[in-house]
Amino acid sequence: IWLTALKFLGKHAAKHLAKQQLSKL
């Protein structure tokens, strides 16, 4: 359960960071 939760959070964080990087560019 923890692994799947971490994977989900990781994907969510990656998307959020990607959006921030795109907005900066």
From Swiss-Prot:
Any GO BP annotation: defense response to bacterium
Tissues of expression: Expressed by the venom gland.
Compartment(s) of residence: Secreted; Target cell membrane
Source taxon at top rank: Eukaryota
Sorted UniProt keywords: Amidation, Antibiotic, Antimicrobial, Cytolysis, Hemolysis, Ion transport, Membrane, Neurotoxin, Secreted, Target cell membrane, Target membrane, Toxin, Transmembrane, Transport
An annotated Gene Ontology molecular function: toxin activity
Modified residues (Leucine amide): L25
GO cellular component labels: extracellular region; membrane; other organism cell membrane
Miscellaneous field: Mutated toxins are expressed as transgene in yeasts. Yeasts containing transgenes cause lethality when feed to lepidopteran larvae (S.frugiperda).
Family to which this protein belongs: Belongs to the cationic peptide 04 (cupiennin) family. 05 subfamily.
Function: Forms pore that permeabilize the cell membrane. Promotes efflux of calcium from synaptosomes, causes hemolysis, and dissipates voltage gradients across muscle membrane. Potently inhibits the growth of bacteria, yeast and Leishmania. Is lethal to lepidopteran larvae. May function both in the prey capture strategy as well as protection from infectious organisms arising from prey ingestion.
Protein name as it appears in the record: M-lycotoxin-Hc1a
